[in-house]
Regions:
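Gly/Ser/Thr-rich phosphate-binding loop
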Residues: 81-86, 95-165, 178
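Conserved AMP-binding/adenylation subdomain of ANL enzymes
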Residues: 16-33, 41-82, 97
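Active-site glycine-centered loops adjacent to acidic/histidine catalytic or metal-binding residues
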Residues: 115, 139, 171, 233, ...
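Conserved AMP-binding A3 loop
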Residues: 1-17
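AMP-binding/adenylate-forming catalytic core of the ANL superfamily
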Residues: 84, 202, 207-208, 227, ...
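AMP-binding/adenylate-forming catalytic domain of the ANL superfamily
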Residues: 295, 320-344
Length: 354
């Protein structure tokens, strides 16, 4: 979704190990049926919804197009699927499709979002429409791909309640995975709720980048005998072990000497946009070079009229306490650039903003 595409070398141990980790945390059983609608050229699709059910011997029902919400819903209903994985982008489409009845998703016991940040408005709208909670996970192709995941709460053998999820986080590290938060310059490990670079270690960490030793050395670091993947993500871990993603380090704009998170701006804007049930409004915040400020923030938004922009500008001015976070420009575009995996294309968005 950003930078030049790289080939990621995943070994048999990486893939089999992560598939086993995933199966363990979601407690797959012989009665489970998983929906296989994610692209197979994407680590989430090939490992979680293809290899994992094959290895575990559970049923997988496939659909070729994850953007076809009604087709996916019919599949879930017909085969009484119990597990569905997707992205925030795809789940958003399902909430807008008025042909999908809540009963079509009734059999699902677990819905997991990954690959990109789960937008709060999507989570809330999905729960409102279908009565189902979306649990957010986190990882990267370089981690085969799952490193952490939120899960439903459950009753322990001693009848205490095990908290499996916290909204706004990406869950706890999955078994066999170590996540550290470190200072991005010194790699000194930081404390609880301190924000820094996220490092991941475990059986799922890749061998390296294909025919690119230089780049591999930049992202794999050995600490106390363990190999860690340097994610490029800024985050923190709370007192209960739940991981929160702040943003990509590359998704910060420097204005007035202050580092501004583009993701944080998106979070604020998502709370200001009033989505109607049939609304196709989509947006992304990016930054481009500016002669005066060095950088300027641009909001790209689709499927709106000029009158809507005027109202949105007023809301932004009223609700943004940090004035540096206010977009310098709002551009109406036909569509927000997306990759085949459903992720927003940050590079294409930056070009579109110029």
């Amino acid at each position: 979704s950003e930078g030049i595409p790289k080939g990621v070398e995943l070994t048999g141990d990486n893939i089999l190990g992560n598939a086993q980790q995933i199966a363990n945390i979601i407690n797959v059983n012989e009665d489970d049926t998983i929906v296989g609608s994610l692209p197979l050229f994407h680590a989430f699709g090939i490992v979680v919804t293809t290899y994992m059910p094959l290895i575990e011997g559970i049923k997988c029902v496939a659909h070729p197009d994850p953007t076809d919400g009604l087709g996916v819903a019919k599949l879930v209903s017909k085969y009484k699927a119990t597990i569905m994985c997707g992205t925030s982008t795809f789940f958003r489409l399902y909430t807008k499709n008025q042909k999908i009845h809540p009963l079509m998703f009734e059999s699902l016991r677990l819905i997991v979002a990954g690959a990109e940040k789960l937008r709060e408005d999507v989570r809330v709208e999905f729960k409102k429409r279908f009565g189902k909670e979306i649990f957010e996970g986190y990882g990267a192709t370089e981690t085969s791909p799952v490193a952490s995941c939120n899960l439903p709460d459950k009753v322990a053998p001693d009848f205490s309640i095990q908290i499996g999820h916290k909204m706004g986080t990406v869950g706890m590290p999955i078994p066999g995975t170590k996540i550290k938060i470190v200072d991005p310059q010194t790699f000194k490990e930081l404390g609880i709720n301190e924000e820094g670079m996220i490092l991941i270690s475990g059986i799922q960490v890749m061998r390296g980048y294909l025919k690119n030793e230089e780049k591999t050395k930049q992202v794999l670091k050995v600490i106390n005998g363990k190999t860690y993947y340097i994610t490029g993500d800024k985050g923190k871990i709370d007192e209960d072990g739940f991981v929160t993603i702040v943003d990509r380090y590359s998704r910060f704009a420097k204005l007035g000497g202050e580092m501004i998170s583009l993701g944080a701006i998106e979070d604020k804007i998502s709370k200001l946009i009033e989505l109607k049930e049939d609304s196709l409004i989509d947006f992304i915040v990016t930054s481009i070079e500016d002669e005066k400020k060095g950088e300027k923030i641009v909001l790209l938004i689709s499927h709106v009229e000029n009158e809507y922009i005027l109202e949105l500008k007023e809301k932004i001015l009223k609700n943004f306490e940090n004035k540096l976070m206010i977009p310098s420009e709002i551009k109406i575009v036909q569509d927000i650039p997306k990759l085949g995996s459903g992720k927003k294309d940050f590079n294409a968005s930056k070009i579109l903003a110029k």
